[in-house]
């Protein structure tokens, strides 16, 4: 296990259960200068904000013109899987937005972190709009479309999965626990579905859907990176490894049940056992990014995911990031502690 940073304190279990005094955490201390960004005090947080800013995109940049041809060639199981993945994503982004608006934006008093969360909230709105547009495009029956858009209330397996992050929003747990909870949401809860959509890309299907998946998975990787940055570098009171594991393992179990049983990936021709292994691999990657040792020690089972990177390796982002680097926006951005759904470690 990585040593706790200097000045950090690992919380005893009883204090974890009760939460901690927010005033003890630098990120949460009252800050009379929080309404003004400059002078920048937290340069690493600011760099993450600028990195996120350089990755902005809109729904209008996604071409769905060829998707309907592929949609017509899919079998019923494949269409069922895609519909329900999109239905989950459409609602889950709204949950992340609510957490940002109700909790994280008021939890932190550091303007650089608030800037990141504010921009993340906007990007989550773009993700939510994207999934809604995809459903609106693919589903012609208005009644089915409404059922899928309201999946958190109408589809039991999606409702069950959504309950976990919703509980974190209303939780009295400390900020560091909720921070890891939502890192698990964006880093683990989305991983199986992202991977399944990349599988469609490998098969040469649904170019609009799979391109949007590249953009959104990249964003979510950056959001997970940011949570790890805050936890590793700016949280004074670390959680015990046992508590971190409890949160991560719980998220893995829920994701594994969802993508392997409730909405089985075999519907699109994927192996459920390998998908379960992949989710464990991703969870270990998140644990390492949080400064902990691996728990599952599972290896990356999908060769096609080796070609996928959430740090902007697509042509779209090579172009976008390059333009901003010329302007100096990201010229000093480092590459350490990046969270990925594909890279081994």
UniProtKB/Swiss-Prot annotation:
Cofactor(s) demanded: Fe cation
Catalytic activity: a 2'-deoxyribonucleoside 5'-diphosphate + [thioredoxin]-disulfide + H2O = a ribonucleoside 5'-diphosphate + [thioredoxin]-dithiol
Catalytic residues as annotated in Swiss-Prot or TrEMBL: 131
EC class (word): oxidoreductase
Keywords, in A-Z order: Deoxyribonucleotide synthesis, Iron, Metal-binding, Oxidoreductase
Pfam families noted in UniProt: Ribonuc_red_sm (PF00268)
Positions contributing to Fe cation 2 binding: 124, 186, 220, 223
EC number: 1.17.4.1
Source taxon at top rank: Eukaryota
Gene Ontology annotations of biological process type: deoxyribonucleotide biosynthetic process
Binding site for Fe cation 1: 93, 124, 127
Cofactor note: Binds 2 iron ions per subunit.
Classification via CDD domains: RNRR2
GO molecular function, one term: metal ion binding
UniProt xrefs under PROSITE patterns: RIBORED_SMALL
Stated family: Belongs to the ribonucleoside diphosphate reductase small chain family.
Functional note: Provides the precursors necessary for DNA synthesis. Catalyzes the biosynthesis of deoxyribonucleotides from the corresponding ribonucleotides.
Subunit and partners: Heterodimer of a large and a small subunit.
Protein name: Ribonucleoside-diphosphate reductase small subunit
Organism phylogeny: Eukaryota, Discoba, Euglenozoa, Kinetoplastea, Metakinetoplastina
């Amino acid at each position: 296990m990585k040593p706790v940073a200097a000045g950090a304190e690992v919380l005893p279990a009883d204090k974890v259960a009760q939460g901690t005094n927010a005033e003890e955490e630098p990120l949460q201390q009252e800050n009379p200068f929080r309404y003004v960004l400059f002078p920048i005090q937290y340069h690493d947080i600011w760099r993450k904000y600028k990195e996120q800013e350089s990755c902005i995109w809109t729904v209008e940049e996604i071409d769905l013109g060829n998707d309907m041809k592929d949609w017509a060639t899919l079998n019923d199981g494949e269409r069922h899987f895609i519909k329900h993945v999109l239905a989950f994503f459409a609602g889950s982004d709204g949950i992340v937005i609510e957490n940002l608006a109700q909790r994280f934006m008021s939890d932190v008093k550091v303007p650089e972190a608030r800037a990141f969360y504010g921009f993340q909230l906007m990007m989550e709105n773009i993700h939510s709009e994207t999934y809604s547009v995809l459903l609106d495009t693919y589903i012609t029956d208005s009644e089915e479309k409404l059922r899928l858009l309201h999946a958190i209330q109408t589809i039991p397996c999606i409702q069950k999965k959504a309950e976990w992050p919703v509980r974190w929003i209303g939780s009295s747990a400390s900020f560091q626990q909720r921070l890891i909870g939502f890192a698990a949401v964006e880093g683990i809860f989305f991983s199986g579905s992202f991977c399944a959509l990349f599988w469609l890309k490998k098969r040469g299907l649904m170019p609009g859907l799979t391109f949007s998946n590249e953009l959104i998975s990249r964003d979510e990787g950056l959001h997970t990176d940011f949570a790890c940055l805050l936890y590793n570098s700016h949280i004074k009171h670390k959680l015990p490894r046992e508590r971190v594991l409890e949160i991560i393992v719980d998220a893995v179990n829920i994701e594994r049940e969802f993508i392997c049983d409730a909405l089985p990936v075999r519907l699109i021709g994927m192996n459920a056992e390998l998908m379960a292994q992949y989710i464990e691999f991703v969870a270990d990657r998140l644990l390492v990014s949080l400064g902990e040792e691996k728990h599952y020690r599972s290896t990356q089972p999908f060769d096609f995911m080796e070609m996928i990177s959430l740090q902007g390796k697509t042509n779209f982002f090579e172009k976008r990031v390059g333009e901003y680097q010329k302007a100096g926006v990201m010229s000093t951005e480092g590459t350490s502690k990046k969270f990925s759904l594909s890279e081994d470690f």
